[in-house]
Amino acid sequence: MMIVFHVCSYKKLQRYVKTGGIMPPVRAWENIEQAERMSKSTGRRIILRLKFPGDAPKLEGHFNQARVLNTRYDLGCI
C-alpha cells in the first residue's frame, strides 16, 4: 500500500460522499507538495489522503509523481 493525495473541489467531495466512492480513473499525487501545487493552480481546495495499491501505475507526465487507479475507490468515512 502507498499513501497518495487526491485533489478535488467541494462539489466533487459532496458527490463522493453521496455515492460512497470515487469513480475511475482515480488520479492522485505521490507527495503532498505536488498535491498542494495542483490545488493552488486549479483552485480545488480539498486534498484527500488515500491508500493505493503499491503497484498502481504511474500517470504519464505529471512530473512522474502521479498515480492512477482504474477501478472505483470506495470511501470508508470522511
Please tell me what each predicted stretch does:
Residues M1-M2, Y10-L13, T19-I78:
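Conserved NAD+-utilizing ADP-ribose enzyme module
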